[in-house]
Amino acid sequence: MHTKLVTIETNTDQPLDGAWYEPDGGSTVGAAMICHGNTMNFYVGAPRFLPPALTKLGFACLSFNRRGHDVLSNRNSRSVEGAAFQTTAEGMEDNEFAAAWIMDKGYKAPVIIGHSNGGFLGVQYVSQHPETPAMVLLSAHAGGTLAKHELPRDGLLAGPKTLERRKEAEAMIANGRGDEIMVFPGWWYVATARSYLDRLTTMPSTVETAPKIFCPTLYIRGDQESRNGYPAEDFSAKSSGSCDVEIVANCEHYYNGRQDEIIKLVSNWLVRQFNLESILNH
């Protein structure tokens, strides 16, 4: 496997950083695009542990940062970036930039693989790109009213004070302070007023988008995760394409200690979808 750090231009001054993984001898199957979860990045979680397995199957892989990576970060100045500033629309744009970068290298439409918020955004991308050959959802969240109802119950972001903090964010935006940071008691702890309100109001529903998905899908969820928050079965029932659901035992949202099982499930499923049995047997 060969690995190269890459930079992908966007429509702002902030590019997307990532890693491009190629099999020894080059890709023989196609490409995969791996999308990280909220406040994560391309060198942790699935974007890190999946490429070695996928390149063995013949896939080239792009693991990349969205502009909303980590919680807060800075690169070559004191200007900061990260998930505290992210919007749903920006995340969707970033997938378009990343996929276009892959196809500019001569590849056909990539397999889309996304963890958590990366999976949520992946569903929206694939709904607009029916040429996508396959999609893997790793605990893709429900979108829709998730931030409004589920996250407060789980104590995330503003928790039970969501309505109160939403009004505060709306007032800040009305007063021209939309880019100022708000502090919250729950993960991910800080967000601008604009980003926080965006999170509460702009996310499409993953399940309601399912009828627009025509490619085969693998949807994985850990058994310690909420079915409402990560609605694999409901998505499968509504998808226009086939959708296989796998519930992993003794598994939480970040797959700690269960990475090998995730790798096995994803690899075996891709082998079946792309008729790669001869590669797996070697």
Stretches with model-predicted labels:
Residues 223-245, 250-251:
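Conserved loop-alpha-helix segment in the C-terminal half of the alpha/beta-hydrolase fold
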Residues 82-104:
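Alpha/beta-hydrolase active-site loop
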Residues 136-146:
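Active-site nucleophile loop of the alpha/beta-hydrolase fold
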